[in-house]
Structure formats: C-alpha cells, structure tokens
Curated annotation (Swiss-Prot):
Residues 26-143 form the DOMON domain. Coiled coil: none annotated. GO terms for cellular component: extracellular region. It comes from Caenorhabditis elegans. Keywords: Glycoprotein, Secreted, Signal. PROSITE patterns: DOMON (PS50836). Residues 1-18 form the signal peptide. Glycans are attached at residues 47, 128. This is DOMON domain-containing protein Y73F4A.1. It is found in: Secreted. Disulfide bonds: none annotated.
Amino acid sequence: MFVLAIVFAFVFIPSSSSVTCDFKNELVSMNWNVKNNKIQIHFEHNNLTENRWTSIAFGDGPGMNNLESIIFSRREDNVITTNSGYTPKKKKVVVDDVSYVTVNDVQITGNKLKVTVSRPLGPAGPRNFSLDQCLNWMVVPGGSLSNGKFKKHHGKIFFIKDVCAAKCTAERIQRINSNKAL
C-alpha cells in the first residue's frame, strides 16, 4: 500500500522541475514569469549589431507559418524598436500597426541587447493571441533590416517545446530554483 502511494505521488502530482521558465545558449538568454495575468519576458541577445533584428515567436512550429512574434530591431542609429507581428506564411512577417507588448526596460551596451517586455497572458492584439496555454516558443537569432523592412533570418532557430508560461509564477520559479540548489 505504501509503495502504491509513492507511485501515485510520482505519477499524478506534476513536478515543479518540469516547468520551463527560461532558455539560454551562447547567443541568447531569456526568462519569463507571470503575475496578475501578465507575462513579463526578459530577453538578452549577445550580438545584435546595427541594422539587424531578432525575435521570439509563439505557435505550433517548428515551421514558420502562423506564428505570433515579438520582434526586436536595432537601427543604424542604435535605436532599438520593439514590434509585435505574425507570420501568415513562411518567410513573411506582417508587423502590427500598433504593438501590443509594453517595453519595460531596454539597454544596448556594445552589441549586447537587454530588453524586458510584458503583455497580457490571455488573448491580446489584433488576432487575440493567447499565451495562457502550453505551446512552442522559438527564438530567431537574427536577420537583416533594410529600409525599415525585416529581411529573411539567417542561422538556426532555437526551438523550446511545450512552454506552459502560465505556470511560471514567482512562487513556482523560487521553488524550482530552491530544488536546483539541492
């Protein structure tokens, strides 16, 4: 009976360590958390040069169709812009007339970009896109920017499978970090 109870606990009680609330590699790092039904995303890119863009995309993937995007770009004059948009078909990004993400902080030091944005966790923007369900996230490391237009990206896309952002609350992240320290 005792063994059955232990098996039940492991099978039916979700582990807090299985929640993905961050991503990091040699080029980009980001983490996200939810508070008061808003998601805040802190994103860093280690080599965003002038006239380049990078983005975070959300959707089924791994193909580039029907993805919702947050796009960060660096113009020739070092101005950083943040847009929201979507990809109705591969190789084409349609930028929203009004971005539905709020920029909380942005810094550029050399070629290192640090930006923190927030948006509603639930339906937002012209397509009522929601991040409250588990879905795939993709990081597009970059592409060129020409006359304000986003050109095709180059290089590998980083794929983060089944992100359940709604589970990334401060309390849960603290528990996960405490478990990692053990």
